[in-house]
Each structure stands twice: as C-alpha cells, then as structure tokens.
Amino acid sequence: MKLLIRSEPADCEDKIFARRAYIYRMQAPSDSAAVGEALLASFRHNFQQYKTLADRALAQISPEEWLYQPASGSNSAAVIVQHMVGNLRSRFTDFLTSDGEKPTRQRDQEFAEPATVASIAALQAEWPAAWQILFMLLDELRADDLLRPVLIRGEAHTVLQAVQRQVAHYASHVGQLVQLAKIIRGDDFQSLSIARGQSQQFNQAMTENR
C-alpha cells in the first residue's frame, strides 16, 4: 500500500505529514505476496484465538453440563461443538479441490442433542482433530492461493472470501460457548478476558511490561 504525498509540502504541518507518509510507505509491504502472507498469518492467529477461547470456556463445564440448554429450542455446548466439528471437516477437507459442503455431511444431525453424557467423550476427541484440518490447510496455503476459486454449495468464492466467511462464523459460535459457560458457572466463572473493574490495572501492567 502506498500513500500519495505532495512533492513540495506547503508548510510545516504538511512536511510532518509527508515525513510520516514516507516512513509508513517504507515500512509497509511492497507487494501483494507480502500482504497475502500477512493475511494468512492473521487468519491463523484469529482461528487459534477462537479455539483457545472455546477450550478455556469448555474446560469450566462438566460433561453433564455440555448437555445444558438455557431455554427450550436453544443449543447446548455439545450441539455447538458438534456443529463446528461438522463444519470444520466439511469446509476444509480437500478445500481447494472439492465443494466445501461435502455430500457426506449430515448438517441437520449436527443440531440433534446427544442422547447421553456418554457421547461427550467422543465429541471432546473430535473437536481438536477437526480444528487440526483447518490449521494444516493454513500451513499449506500461500499468498497466490488467496484469489483461487473454491465452491461452497456450488457457489464460487475466492479462497480469501471462503476463509473470511469462516472467521465470522466461528467467532459467533465461540461467543455462544463462552456465554453458556458463564451461565452455567455463574459467579464461579473464570473470566477469559479483562475482568470487570480491572481495566486500569490491566492497562498499567501492559505499559510496565513493554
């Protein structure tokens, strides 16, 4: 990305702006490959953060509590995990060469509540394995893949669009898992971000650790 600047700044303020623009231009990526690699790194970072957040929320509830539904018709943690596992597998298996909605996927079954708590152990094992499919793909993708076409339900997307779509999708479901854990644990919930009333202390600690 380059910024257009005046060749002859009119005053001191313009000179300052021009200098800052020049510095930014020198520091910014100079080609699309660098931008693409930065995007892929950002995607991996975001997905890893979402998984970590979900893991920390799920660690605070028991297998029995995975089946808790806060209201009739709402999804339990088990159903949300079940759905995300199915989505991860379908979207990112053979990502570049097959439709992201696999014919073998049974999406409606992902929203069926598990019959017993005994099924939670298998679901807990499937969860990290499904995420690994995504992380392995991100390790393989390169900047020049981002504009390649892929299909989801027969609709064409670029790789960039398809991955960004899942960033938003998983963020919403991870938020649901965190909220469920907060409802279940109540006052005993261990905060996964800056605790209430602790913003100033957190900011001070960040400043001191720079």
Q: What is the predicted role of each segment?
A:
Residues P29-R44, A112-T116:
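Short, charged, low-complexity loops and linkers
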Residues A112-V150, H157-A171, Q176:
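Acidic/histidine-rich alpha-helical segments that form the ligand environment
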Residues L58, S62, L138-R142, A181:
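A structural signal for long alpha-helical coiled-coils and helix-turn connectors
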Residues E13, A28-S30, R44-Q48, T52-D55, ...:
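Short, contiguous alpha-helical
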Residues F43, F47, K51, L58, ...:
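Hydrophobic alpha-helical core bundles mediating ligand binding, dimerization, or RNAP-core interactions
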Residues M1-R25:
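N-terminal amphipathic/basic-hydrophobic helices that include classical n-h-c signal peptides
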